[in-house]
Amino acid sequence: MSQRITRRQLLESALAVIPVAAFCALPQPSFGAIPFKLGIITDEITQDFGNALDFIASYSLRYCELRDLWRTNIMNLSKDDRQRAKDLLDKHQFHVSDIGSPIMKYNLPEMPAREEKRDTFRANFTEQDTERLLDESFELARFFNTSKVRIFSYWRVSDPETAYPYVRDRLAKAAEIAHKADILLVLENEHECNVGTGKELGRVLKDINSANLRGNWDAGNAAMLDEVPYPDGYRQVKGWIAHTHVKDVKKNPQTGKLSWAPVGGGFIDWKGQLEALRNDGYDGTMSLETHYRRPDGNKLESTRESLEGLLKIFKNL
């Protein structure tokens, strides 16, 4: 039976076959020195890993975050594709900021399961896989010459406080395993998970107080839970973070609905946040996690718009 192809699918298919070099060949504006170890999550640009790296290199950035390559979650990547990815990274002389794993981005067994479909970036794991995933993510980190693995805090339940003891204890156990492997876990505050705000992230990091567990501060995710990311959320995690995600959020004035925006096009005080990170001597890594999409759905150009918004903020620091 034939399937109808929508206009958006047709456009995305057409864009997919245009070499990214054609986009990168456009003149790039000069933004001056960047005071952070800035990179991009590659699948936010394109699923073609090589093309994604070409795009990052066109802006003279030297970091990237690995999550989903060639339509395969990083945890499911074959040995051949791992080597292919490493060869491309070496070609560009890139650094990997962290392994963007899906660890603990699934249901917490002690809590009622949430059945609705959520974005797991082609990962389909459960709590039974956790220890194996930790071990395999540590191997990936060593292979890609990074010390950091990003993790989560299980799908958010209606009352995260009831889940907190279980989440805390499992994260503490993961930190112990990471200590033995000399790996740093970075816990992302994810608005779909039980640790979603700066307040929640700061609390669990301080309660566990492990040198092998630090935060992946995501101001955009905090905003999605109605926290003021800067200065309120950041105040809770200051000094406890080793990785940051950059994206922006806007509010529809008629409906009040929140949605992703290009950096600088939303309400997050990114200038204040970046100035604070610089003044506080932040030495961790930073990834643009676009999420925002233009009306035409073009991921690469959406990322370009967001990246250039971020670079303009850097220029004015």
Question: What is the predicted role of each segment?
Answer:
Residues 78-93, 98:
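Aromatic-lined substrate-binding rim segments of carbohydrate-active enzymes
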Residues 44-46, 68-70, 102-105, 153-157, ...:
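Active-site-proximal loop/turn and secondary-structure-junction residues that shape catalytic pockets
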Residues 67-85, 157-158:
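Glycine-rich, proline-tolerant flexible connector loops at the mouths of alpha/beta enzymes
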Residues 91-94, 140-145, 174-185, 273-282, ...:
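A structural motif corresponding to the C-terminal end of an alpha-helix
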Residues 52, 85, 137, 174, ...:
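Aromatic/hydrophobic pocket-lining residues that form π-stacking "cages" and hydrophobic walls in ligand
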Residues 14-15, 20-25, 107-215:
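Active-site acidic/histidine proton-transfer and metal-coordination neighborhood
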Residues 2-4, 8-25, 31-38, 46-62, ...:
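Histidine-acidic metal/acid-base catalytic patches
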